[in-house]
Amino acid sequence: MSIENAFRLPSPLPQWPPGTGFGGGTIDLGGLLVSQVSTFTKIWAAQEGGPDGMGATFFEPSAVPDGFHVLGHYGQPNNAPLFGWVLVAKDVTNGGRAALQTPVDYTLVWSSENAKIKQDGAVYIWAPVPSDGYKPVGHVVTASPQKPPLDKIRCVRVDFTDVSETEDWIWGTNGLNVYSSRPKNRGTKDSGVSTGTFLAGDSVPSCLKNLNTPNPSSMPNLPQIKSLLQTYSPWIYFHPDEEFLPSSVPWFFKNGALLYTKGQESSPAPIEQTGANLPQGGNSDGAYWLDLPTNDADKDRVKKGNLQDCTCYVHVKPMLGATFTDIALWMFYPFNGPARAKVEFLTIKLGKIGEHVGDWEHVTLRISNFNGELKRVYFSEHSRGMWVSASQVEFQNGNKPVVYSSLHGHAAYPAPGLVLQGSKVIGIRNDTEKGNTVMDTGASFSIVSAEYLGSVVTEPPWLNYAREWGPKINYDIAKELKKVERFMPGKLKAELEKVVRSLPNEVLGEEGPTGPKWKDSWSGDERS
């Protein structure tokens, strides 16, 4: 689908349970009331350049609510359906210096008059010139060389602004690149707010700032969180050849997982089902670690996990100045299987490389606090991952995203197929396929943390275990590679070793991972 088609979620949104501000259509940033507008009037389009060479289209927000003002226009690549939004704002300061002000002038950022591109006539991109004490948070796009009217847009009082940065590339041609924007600081306690507008050329408009954080009345309460999970909980498909499935944490503990203490390796301790006897807090200092049962039969059984006794663990957090809710859904796998490499036309098993005990993977749903609409899904892929617009996600049973878990490594992907870490000739395989083994995360989830709700959600003891969920394994990479390199042409041996050694230790299997709470995404944005 192209931008000519507007994207809508497959099913209408439900009526959310009552609360203080979530889903109410507007959010008060502390004297600046903002609303999310997703209806647009097309201004101009290019038919080439940008992602996939398909061009980009620029829009003016329309159907702006009474009393609200435009802060900037919207741009999007043409290689996806129209699924955008911008914030519009209303001054509710009740006296004092106004939160919004018209610009005093415009400067021309770029014109396509002399650009030799396929385009709908000429376009002019303008930067507002603010009066003292105000900043622009967006650009204006026109099809006329005349400057826009001064009341076309509003600049924002400086204390309602924060530092922004570029995010995704929208479009570019000689002398100009256009990007979407986001706040530079994006932790759970940061107050920067995305405006939905774009950045063009060298000018970097600010983003907004929520002066009401850290009191996020716009965030969902517990009944609303449960309703969001009923609406958007993903389906996870496992590869038909997957041997190592997820389980619940209590199942792992009660089936023989052991707690080891440095210096007392000969006497590991069984673990209580809630993890009550695990050391709490601290850091990853090698003093403690978990491992599989010592009995070989039990070890092999626990490695395989138990999908019938599996729970998805949910962490809910405010993002982008509490204008969005991130719902991270964490899956625990007792064991991560061995890696495989693609070498030209061959698939080669890499021995013990990639094996490790205790594998935590997650998917994150980014939901608008204005209306409860799912906007993006984050697919974690080992130490990094990628955000995917809801318009590019596969859905099943209404508005539930489909996730594909890679064979042995359990990385999450939005579509089936092969993704290589490395080059097209040689790399580590991440294979996904829609097998018959599938998990409905909405059928078995546990909300383990929502810090902004205070004592409403009680965190289980295992969540505050800061050490590794598997032992550190020191195996000889060169020795493991030597076992497989005899099948390879000589020129590719060094290249394979380079790819393998570039993998992070958690992926290599040299050390067990820490739990969800000790990832930097727990209190920050996802890595992408």
Question: What do the predicted segments below correspond to?
Answer:
Residues 366-370:
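Short beta-strand micro-motifs enriched in acidic
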Residues 68-76, 85, 101-105, 137-140:
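Short, surface-exposed polybasic-aromatic patches that bind anionic ligands, especially phosphate groups
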